[in-house]
Every structure is written in structure tokens, then in C-alpha cells.
């Protein structure tokens, strides 16, 4: 017997009463959705918990209110079970006989009687009270995950609100994934057990951490090399003068990877790392809701533009993570992944780690580590790969335009 209630089909009634949502309406809904999903009452939405079930039920209710149709295996829900391996070096596997951790994807559909379908997704799970994925050092605390990823989940609902009222040349499948924090479990399960024919999928859009658009309006978009159609379209619809920072690879630490590995074009939208990432301080009041709406509107314009083109060609990309060096030490910083200047800019510093002990701060730009010149993230990682625990080296960084050097011990 299911421990969540099945949502009734009231979509047709809701649709009949709707009008095109205004910016004010959308911002109010974004705030409402993020505030609910990131509330303490949901206890961090960890997969397999009551908080995750409540979040899934909430998204099913939102989809129903908006007027999109259920497309799970049980109404809006697609339940899945993964078993955790006893060996930490082995991957989790789909469980049998109900053993393991059970989660649920929430899936809705807009059927425009089109030949092609666009998948739009965002994960709604988070870390619960922390665990191995947390960067928090201290007593156990609820990790509300407002940016990661209540922001993307709220954006998912906002796009459904916009697209349900417009007759487009594509169908739309909306998926709120669970189990992303555990290793893309929900999206992995979906692509192996799809509720539509994957041959009809044109491309997939993933929104993960889109709630912290900065003053420069910097928006990272990963996967632009997975179809030749993406880059021209992304530039064409950038009427808000967003500062786009792009990468080609379709592989990354979020749910778009599962679809890329099925030979589908993918895009991952991301407004950047911050010092609240995977910490209890990632709360709803820190979300830039106007910026979140800008991301939603931008994606809506992109979808409209790509709807004017034939089915997108898929291009395999070089896996940037495959070339990443292996390293056994850490500086203890959160890099600013949106920084496009020379060096590696620090977006956060972990307590009691080598960087903090050496005096480095948020905003410092690392330009040299040992004998290695740091020009970007890859050169920074290569430099780290040369060191072993216990070794010392000089680190050079820029602060307020001045070069500073310090001794760092790993």
C-alpha cells in the first residue's frame, strides 16, 4: 500500500480557469514553492524520508493545479528502489523485493500532439540532516537546500505554468527527480524505465542551482556542445544581456548526464557555487527570486526558438571530467565556477583546511601553486595532483589587485 496519496485528475478544471501568468504571479509562485520545499518541516528532503514524500506530493499537486497530465507509473509518481552497496567502491543497484532505499520521481506531461518531446527536469531531493555530502562541520542540522535544488524545482513548475498556456510545436515532459544527491538515481532509473518513448525526445533541459543569479547576471550553461543548434540559439534569445559562461561537455554531476548517456542533446543551467552550498545555511531568504525568474524566462525563449528548428542533431562531447587529474589533497576551498578571468577565484573557504590556515579568503584569486601557474580550473586541479598529504608549498594569490604569497601545508 502506497504511503502517499494519489492525486486526482483535476487538471482540466485548473486549466480552464487559467490565464497567462504575469511576472508578479510567477515570482509569487517561485517564492511559495521554494519556501515550502526548503522549510524545516521537510527536514532536508533526503530520499526515502517523510520529507521527500511530502515534497513529491507537493509537486504532484502543483502539476495538477497547473493543468498538466500525469505521466508516471502511478499517477504523477514513478517509484524506484536502489540498494546501497556494502563496498563503497561499488555503484548502487536497482533493488529487488522492495529492499534498499525507495524514492519517487514526479512526472507530468503536456501533450501538444507533436512528434517530438522536450524533457525539462530538476531534482527536488537534498541532504536531509547532512551526511557524507555535507560540507558542514559541527552538530547535525537540517540542510534545507533552497538553491540546491528547491530553486530548480520551483523553476520547473514555473515553466510548466508558461508552457501549458501556449500551443508549441513540441510536447513537454516535466520531471522532478529524486535521488540526485545519491548519484543521479532518479534520472538513471527514468532513462532505463521511461514513461515515454525516448526516441521521441528532442533534447533535455536540466535546472540545478539556479537561484543565486549574481549582480553580473552570470549564468553557466553546460552541454552546449551536445548539439550544433544550441550556441546560436542561446545567443539569439539573450535579450536580458545575461553573461553566459558555457561548457561543451554533456557529462556533469547532475541529472542531464543520464540523458546525455542515452545520446540525447542536453543543457544544464546553473547560477554558480556559493559558500552555503551543501550547508545548513542554504535557506529560502537567500534566493534571488527576480534572477530566478530571469532564468525561467530565458529558458522559455530558448524553447520557443528551438521549436522553429528541425529535430536537433546529437553530438558526442569530450568528457572534461575524464581528463581531470586524480589528487589526494585538497586546498579546502569552493572555486567560483563562473569566474572567467585568469586564475582560480575562491568562492568559499572551509574551516580548518589548508587554505584557511594559510590565510586565504573568499574573493582571492589563486595564480600559482608550487611551480605551477594557475590560469583556470583545469590547471588548478593539475597542480593539486602533484602533491601528497603532509607536503608544503607556496601559494600565490591576488587580493585587491596585489599579489600575495603564503605557505600552505596539505
Stretches found by the model and what they are:
Residues 108, 118-126, 130-184, 298-299:
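Alpha-helical metal-binding/catalytic segments enriched in His/Glu/Asp
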Residues 357-377:
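Conserved PDZ fold ligand-binding element
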Residues 24-54, 61, 65-74, 203, ...:
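N-terminal capping segment at the start of a domain
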Residues 45-110:
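A non-catalytic alpha/beta surface segment that caps or lines the substrate-entry region
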Amino acid at each position: 500500500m502506497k504511503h502517499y496519496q494519489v492525486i486526482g485528475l483535476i487538471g482540466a478544471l485548473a486549466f480552464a480557469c487559467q490565464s497567462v501568468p504575469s511576472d508578479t504571479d510567477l515570482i509569487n509562485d517561485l517564492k511559495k514553492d521554494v519556501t515550502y520545499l526548503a522549510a524545516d518541516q521537510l527536514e532536508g528532503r533526503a530520499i526515502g524520508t517523510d520529507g521527500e514524500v511530502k515534497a513529491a506530493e507537493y509537486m504532484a499537486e502543483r502539476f495538477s493545479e497547473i493543468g498538466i497530465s500525469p505521466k508516471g507509473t502511478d499517477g504523477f509518481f514513478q517509484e524506484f528502489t536502489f540498494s546501497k552497496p556494502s563496498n563503497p567502491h561499488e555503484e548502487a543497484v536497482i533493488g529487488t523485493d522492495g529492499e534498499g532505499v525507495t524514492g519517487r520521481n514526479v512526472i507530468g506531461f503536456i501533450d501538444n500532439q507533436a512528434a517530438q518531446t522536450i524533457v525539462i527536469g530538476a531534482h527536488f531531493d537534498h541532504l536531509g540532516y547532512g551526511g557524507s555530502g555535507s560540507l558542514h562541520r559541527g552538530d547535525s542540522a537540517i540542510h534545507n537546500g533552497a538553491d540546491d535544488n528547491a530553486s530548480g524545482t520551483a523553476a520547473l513548475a514555473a515553466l510548466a505554468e508558461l508552457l501549458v498556456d501556449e500551443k508549441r510545436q513540441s510536447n513537454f515532459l516535466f520531471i522532478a527527480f529524486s535521488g540526485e544527491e545519491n548519484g543521479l538515481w532518479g534520472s538513471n532509473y527514468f532513462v532505463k524505465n521511461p514513461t515515454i518513448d525516448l526516441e521521441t525526445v528532442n533534447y533535455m533541459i536540466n535546472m540545478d542551482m539556479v537561484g543565486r543569479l549574481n549582480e553580473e547576471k552570470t549564468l553557466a550553461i553546460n552541454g552546449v556542445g551536445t548539439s550544433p543548434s544550441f550556441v546560436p540559439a542561446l545567443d539569439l534569445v539573450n535579450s536580458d544581456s545575461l553573461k553566459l559562461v558555457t561548457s561543451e561537455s554533456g557529462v556533469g554531476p547532475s541529472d542531464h548526464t543520464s540523458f546525455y548517456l542515452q545520446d540525447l542533446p542536453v543543457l544544464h543551467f546553473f547560477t554558480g557555487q556559493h559558500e552555503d552550498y551543501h550547508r545548513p545555511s542554504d535557506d529560502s531568504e537567500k534566493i534571488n527570486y527576480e534572477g530566478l525568474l530571469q532564468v525561467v524566462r530565458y529558458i522559455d525563449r530558448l524553447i520557443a526558438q528551438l521549436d522553429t528548428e528541425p529535430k536537433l542533431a546529437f553530438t558526442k562531447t569530450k568528457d572534461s571530467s575524464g581528463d581531470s587529474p586524480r589528487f589526494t589533497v585538497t586546498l579546502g576551498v569552493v572555486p567560483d565556477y563562473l569566474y572567467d578571468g585568469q586564475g582560480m577565484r575562491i568562492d568559499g573557504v572551509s574551516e580548518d583546511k589548508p587554505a584557511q590556515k594559510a590565510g586565504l579568503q573568499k574573493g582571492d584569486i589563486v595564480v600559482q601553486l608550487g611551480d605551477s601557474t594557475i590560469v583556470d580550473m583545469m590547471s588548478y586541479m593539475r597542480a593539486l595532483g602533484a602533491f601528497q598529504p603532509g607536503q608544503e608549498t607556496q601559494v600565490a594569490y591576488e587580493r585587491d589587485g596585489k599579489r600575495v604569497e603564503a605557505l600552505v601545508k596539505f
